[in-house]
């Protein structure tokens, strides 16, 4: 993929587009080849070889997100059957750790990109709105990974979280309007003050998800 001293134009373009350094891109390219067994693309089943995802309660959603055309910036809806290395880098860039030298404008843009990715994980039907049922589905999946919580406790936590999310967004709803769900603008309000910048990242070599996205 090139060396740090003589960076090919292709590598430079990828670095500018994704924010990764050339060394990080080379590292991710090695991981990409491990996943696809030296093919040119990755399919969903290739993620079955990642041990750290095996017991993640939202594993299916994480894998789905890699093929979501919204996250790939290719279309407003739909799934890709396979992704190439540039697509893989695009998705991994959402998990890129915060840089200490980011100014306020870049940090805000960085935060919005991460939250847009997370929003798409909730918005399963691509309509730009997270319904309360979609919100509950994700929470149910997340909390299913805790064997110490009883079913009634899970339901109470989910309902409470949904009510909190809805109440944060319903102030702008008129008396004759029906609350349909959470838009991305609402989602930004719900997540205001939550440190998504440092929580949502992935270890490059193992692709172990560090994010606690709920």
Curated annotation (Swiss-Prot):
Annotated binding of Ca(2+), by residue: 123, 125, 127, 134
Keyword Lipoprotein in annotation: yes
Domain of life: Eukaryota
Keyword annotations of the record: Calcium, Cell membrane, Cell projection, Cytoplasm, Differentiation, Lipoprotein, Membrane, Metal-binding, Myristate, Nucleus, Protein kinase inhibitor
Tissue specificity as recorded in UniProt: Expressed in the bipotential gonad by E4.5 and expressed in both the testis and ovary by E5.5, but with expression higher in the testis. Expressed in the testis cords but also at low levels in the interstitium. In the ovary, expression is principally in the ovarian cortex, but also in the medulla. Also expressed in the embryonic brain, with expression highest in the region between the nasal placode and olfactory bulb. Also expressed in the embryonic heart and tail.
One cellular-component annotation, GO: cytoplasm
UniProt KW Nucleotide-binding keyword: no
Subcellular localization, as worded in the UniProt entry: Nucleus; Cytoplasm; Membrane; Cell membrane
Domain EF-hand residue range list: 110-145
GO biological process assignments: cell differentiation; cellular response to retinoic acid; positive regulation of granulocyte differentiation; positive regulation of sodium:proton antiporter activity; protein localization to plasma membrane; protein maturation; protein stabilization; regulation of cell adhesion mediated by integrin
SUPFAM superfamilies: EF-hand
Lipidation positions, renumbered (N-myristoyl glycine): 2
InterPro entries tied to this protein: CHP3, EF-hand-dom_pair, EF_hand_dom
GO MF terms held by the record: calcium ion binding; magnesium ion binding; phosphatase inhibitor activity; protein homodimerization activity; protein kinase inhibitor activity
Membrane topology: Lipid-anchor
Comment, domains: Binds calcium via its EF-hands. Calcium-binding mediates a conformational change. Can also bind magnesium.
UniProt similarity note: Belongs to the calcineurin regulatory subunit family. CHP subfamily.
Function: Functions as an integral cofactor in cell pH regulation by controlling plasma membrane-type Na(+)/H(+) exchange activity. Promotes the induction of hematopoietic stem cell differentiation toward megakaryocytic lineage. Essential for the coupling of ERK cascade activation with the expression of ETS family genes in megakaryocytic differentiation. Also involved in granulocytic differentiation in a ERK-dependent manner. Inhibits the phosphatase activity of calcineurin.
Subunit structure: Monomer. Homodimer.
UniProt protein name: Calcineurin B homologous protein 3
Lineage of source species: Eukaryota, Metazoa, Chordata, Craniata, Vertebrata
């Amino acid at each position: 993929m090139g060396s740090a001293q003589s960076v090919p134009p292709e590598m430079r373009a990828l670095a500018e587009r994704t924010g990764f350094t050339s060394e990080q891109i080379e590292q991710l390219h090695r991981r990409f080849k491990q996943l696809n067994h030296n093919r040119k693309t990755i399919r969903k089943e290739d993620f079955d070889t990642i041990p750290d995802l095996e017991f993640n309660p939202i594993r299916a959603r994480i894998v789905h997100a890699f093929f979501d055309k919204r996250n790939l910036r290719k279309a407003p809806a739909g799934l890709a059957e396979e992704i190439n290395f540039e697509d893989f880098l695009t998705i991994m860039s959402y998990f890129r750790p915060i840089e200490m030298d980011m100014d306020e404008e870049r940090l805000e843009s960085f935060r919005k990109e991460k939250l847009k990715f997370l929003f798409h994980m909730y918005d399963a039907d691509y309509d730009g709105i997270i319904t309360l049922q979609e919100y509950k589905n994700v929470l149910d999946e997340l909390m299913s990974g805790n064997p110490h919580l009883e079913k009634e406790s899970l339901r109470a936590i989910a309902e409470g979280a949904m009510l909190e999310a809805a109440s944060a967004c319903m102030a702008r709803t008129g008396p004759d309007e029906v609350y349909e769900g959470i838009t991305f603008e609402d989602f930004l309000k719900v997540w205001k003050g939550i440190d998504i910048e440092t929580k949502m990242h992935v270890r490059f070599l193992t692709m172990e998800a560090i994010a606690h996205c709920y």
